């Protein structure tokens, strides 16, 4: 598709009745948005068909003109989809490009399409439709990512790994439990997507420039035809509103943050020093100089995409923060932020779904690491509370002394002789060794939401029923 043509017709002929001369070339360049808003062509045509149909139903235009308009719009849709439509920068935007082509195809009837409509409510409609469709796509992609994690969680409900705080070994958990943490995160993202769809499910068309219209239009009819729950309730707010776009970017930023945290863990886990996972060749690259390298570039790029998404959110918030009601041309700068963030988010979710699905998990390496760093120290403290009757703070102190002794001897807690433990606290018996293995530690964490395999499987069943 060409971005520009050499025609001399411009949008000035659409709106320039009170102007004595045409715009400067620089004005045309800064004013034009067709380079990016042509992405809205399907939504623009769909909205125009619904509008024309309503106008005819209300006898504002004739049925004959409506039929010409609808046929012409469908012809334009086919031309754009097949790559046979020439977009003109002189015509500013997608609305004027479509209308100019419609006039060429069907003549004067094309001029009736814009009855009871402004580009202000037209672009609000097009953009809202596009964002709604993108949210629906995001919901489906998040569902796929959640499914990939559920499969890995089920596979590894009993696979022990170290749990971390401050990136230091904390307590043993299962890899399945760790996977389910991401299910919860991406489940919240999906819930936010669903709420956002609910928030924007109102049709802007019919608000006109800002005050509504004197024509007897039926906004409920167009809302229903376009798949909206109802029309918007205030015409000024309708053309002023870009909350739906900001909400999309907010959701994208939060989801991107979750993806970035996951990407960071994958990058760390795939290092030889950790060796917890091995990424498939399909989601790795090599080095141009070091033949041995297998780089987690997909994960690193997912991590980087988050920065772009965050930038888009801040950009649109900044664009909107000082605008008086109703429409201002500043709002033309809304779309590129959303388009770019949507593309980044789609790529990131797709890449992460593939990585999670295809990566190889080194359970032996994880289990070995789970026992390092005195990860069962909390289990010793809990045993002292249960079996020796110590207050937890006292048990914490006793356990700290045991850890210090083990460190000085270069051994694990379970390797300390009973005599050494009894020298720290006389009530310790040989039964304490039953809780000092990583398997026993994990199995004991049966509290709701805990890491015990039985609890992980309950969590998986809960999410399977909702995915």
UniProtKB/Swiss-Prot annotation:
Single GO biological process annotation from the record: L-arginine biosynthetic process
Protein's pathway: Amino-acid biosynthesis; L-arginine biosynthesis; L-arginine from L-ornithine and carbamoyl phosphate: step 3/3
Main location: cytoplasm
Catalyzed reaction equations: 2-(N(omega)-L-arginino)succinate = fumarate + L-arginine
Enzyme class of the recorded protein, top EC level: lyase
GO cellular component terms given for this protein: cytosol
UniProt entry tagged with the keyword DNA-binding: no
Swiss-Prot/TrEMBL keywords: Amino-acid biosynthesis, Arginine biosynthesis, Cytoplasm, Lyase
Cell compartments where the protein resides: Cytoplasm
Enzyme Commission number(s) from the entry: 4.3.2.1
Listed InterPro entries: Arg_succ_lyase_C, Argininosuccinate_lyase, Fumarase/histidase_N, Fumarate_lyase_CS, Fumarate_lyase_fam, Fumarate_lyase_N, L-Aspartase-like
Disulfide bridge map: none
GO molecular function, one term: argininosuccinate lyase activity
Pfam families on file: ASL_C2, Lyase_1
Similarity comment text for this entry: Belongs to the lyase 1 family. Argininosuccinate lyase subfamily.
UniProt-listed PANTHER family: ARGININOSUCCINATE LYASE
This protein's name: Argininosuccinate lyase
Species per Swiss-Prot/TrEMBL record: Rhizobium johnstonii (strain DSM 114642 / LMG 32736 / 3841) (Rhizobium leguminosarum bv. viciae)
């Amino acid at each position: 598709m060409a971005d520009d043509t050499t025609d001399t017709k411009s949008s000035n002929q659409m709106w320039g009745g009170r102007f004595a001369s045409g715009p400067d070339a620089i004005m045309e360049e800064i004013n034009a948005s067709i380079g990016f808003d042509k992405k809205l062509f399907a939504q623009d045509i769909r909205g125009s068909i619904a509008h024309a149909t309503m106008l005819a139903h209300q006898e504002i235009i004739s049925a004959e003109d409506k039929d010409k308009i609808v046929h012409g719009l469908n012809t334009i849709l086919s031309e754009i989809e097949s790559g046979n439509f020439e977009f003109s920068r002189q015509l500013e935007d997608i609305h004027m490009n479509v209308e100019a082509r419609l006039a060429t195809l069907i003549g004067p009837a094309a001029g009736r399409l814009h009855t009871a409509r402004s580009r202000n409510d037209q672009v609000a409609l097009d953009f809202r439709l596009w964002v709604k469709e993108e949210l629906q796509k995001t919901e489906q992609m998040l569902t796929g990512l959640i499914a990939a994690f559920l499969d890995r969680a089920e596979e590894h409900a009993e696979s022990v790994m170290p749990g971390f705080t401050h990136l230091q070994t904390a307590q043993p958990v299962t890899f399945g439990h760790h996977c389910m943490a991401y299910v919860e995160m991406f489940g919240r993202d999906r819930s936010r997507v669903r709420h956002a769809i609910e928030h924007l499910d109102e049709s802007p068309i019919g608000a006109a420039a800002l005050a509504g219209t004197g024509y007897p239009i039926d906004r409920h009819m167009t809302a229903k035809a376009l798949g909206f729950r109802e029309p918007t309730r205030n015409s000024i707010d309708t053309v002023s509103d870009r909350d739906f776009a900001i909400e999309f970017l907010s959701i994208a930023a939060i989801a991107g943050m979750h993806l970035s945290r996951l990407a960071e863990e994958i990058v760390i886990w795939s290092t030889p020093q950790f060796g917890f996972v091995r990424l498939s060749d399909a989601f790795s690259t090599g080095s141009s100089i070091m033949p041995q390298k297998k780089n987690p570039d997909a994960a690193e790029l997912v991590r980087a995409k988050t920065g772009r998404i965050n930038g888009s959110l801040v950009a649109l918030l900044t664009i909107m923060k000082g605008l008086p009601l109703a429409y201002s041309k500043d709002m033309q700068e809304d779309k590129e932020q959303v388009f770019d963030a949507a593309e980044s988010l789609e790529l990131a979710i797709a890449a992460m779904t593939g990585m999670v699905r295809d990566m190889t998990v080194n359970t032996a390496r994880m289990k070995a690491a789970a026992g390092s760093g005195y990860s069962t120290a909390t289990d010793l403290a809990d045993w002292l509370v249960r079996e020796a009757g110590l207050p937890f703070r006292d048990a914490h102190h006793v356990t700290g002394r045991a850890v210090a002794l083990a460190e000085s001897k270069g051994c694990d807690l379970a390797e300390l002789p009973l005599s050494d433990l009894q020298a720290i606290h006389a009530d310790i018996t040989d039964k304490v060794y039953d809780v000092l293995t990583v398997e026993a530690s994990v199995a004991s964490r049966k509290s709701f939401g805990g890491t015990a395999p039985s609890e992980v499987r309950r969590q998986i069943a809960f999410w399977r029923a909702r995915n």
